[in-house]
Amino acid sequence: MALVPVDLPAPDALRGRWAAFAAICAARGWGRSCHADGPRWHFDDGGGNWADLVHVGDGRAVLLGHDHEYSDTYYAEAAAYFGEPETDLLAGAPEWWAPPVRAAATPESWVGFAYGFDGAQWWRAPYELDDGFASVGLPALDDARYRDLAAAFTDDAPDRVAVPDAAAFDALAAAGPDVSPDLLRRVVGPTWDAEAGAAAARRFRI
């Protein structure tokens, strides 16, 4: 079966926004919801929907995750558990996709989508079902989504002199893994832990 191309930014283009959002989350004490752990970048919305980007070497990566409401694809044990036909998310995929997908496909963490980046293009297995990726709300995907979610997550930050504008959020994303505590304070104010936020951003360095 021929793989299907997926129109998504390359991992390097996702890095800045992902790191910036992780910095915001860590600064307010929500670091588990968005973080980097070695080669794995994680995001979840706190409601059971999640996405991980796993770097597997040679410029390649696997993006996988699940939306518990909108993923109509049932992979591996999920098919038997829910009594649904299985969607083979690895059909036609090279072997390097398999380890992160199989490791994540547990009864505690169903996998609804799995995309592979070969260094130039994202791909997925052929299927017609909604895999739930669009509903996960990954803030790293584009500027508008990142700004909206970053603004929502900082809306109740105490002691800010002014509400940050789009340029302030964009500056965080442009800095990415090099976010400084001072730059982060322009968005989150003086009370949240900007040092922890900057440390979280640094973990997105490869």
Where are these regions (language model features)?
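N-terminal domain-onset segments
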Residues: M1-G48, H55-D58, T73-I206
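Short hydrophobic-aromatic micro-motifs
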Residues: L53, A61-L63
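Short glycine-rich, polar/acidic loop-and-turn segments at beta strand-coil junctions
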Residues: G57-G59, D67-H68
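Short, solvent-exposed aromatic-acidic interface loops
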Residues: G65-T73
